[in-house]
Amino acid sequence: MRLSGKVAVVTGAGSGMGRSTALLFAREGATVVGSDINAANLEAVTAEATAAGGKMIGVLGNIAKREDAEALIQRAIDDYGQLDVLVNNAGIMDAMEGVANFKDETFERVMGVNLYGPFVTCRAAVKHMKERGKGAIVNVASVAGVSGAAAGAVYTASKHALIGLSRNTAYAYAPFGVRCNTLIVGGVETAIMAGADPAKFDHEALAQYGKWHAVNPRTLQPDEVAKLSLFLVSDEASGVNGAEVAVDGGWTAAC
């Protein structure tokens, strides 16, 4: 198992890509500390991981709040004495507002989850990882982080900035054995694509959206993203640092 003996924190673990990542990491031998704002979802994925023979605990919290983000990292260290892996997966979309009409509350909410939360968790994690001389971080961004659009100004800006955080972290902490990479994710079949309301998820519309932008005419599944996260945090990717790695079905081929 590729993560045997390692402790991994996964944010947004209650659904979508985070859920798939937490379950896969647990199957690969990691002790998973999963965080989510949705108690029912977090309880369900924790139970599923445990029932399958894995090790996972759930920590309820809002990653956009400094105290919750810091407590999450500290919980892993306090309970298990180490932190080997951090996956900043939690993310939300805006109302697809352009720069001329975005709302202040939208900016604060989206930047809080998509950027401030990862800043705080990275800050807490790298201090511990530096002392241990090893660690791996994956920040989950988006094709919006390497391209532009007429709408979604705040979301796009948050993902561009997240890539900057990853690069800076990789450069600063490489001498101490800490790696940090970014996943560039395309259209994935998750609740975030429907405003976090699964009942509104339009599979056909999302598939068509993907066709306009990608070589691969289908939406991706959360498991496909999780598998790449697994590779990036494993020892197999020991030479990969400060990189943006796309799992987008070919979307960025046109960028």
Segments from the language model and where they lie:
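Short, small/polar-rich loop/turn modules that mediate ligand/substrate recognition or access, typified
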Residues: 174, 179, 240-242
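Residue(s) in the substrate-gating loop at a strand-loop-helix junction
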Residues: 142
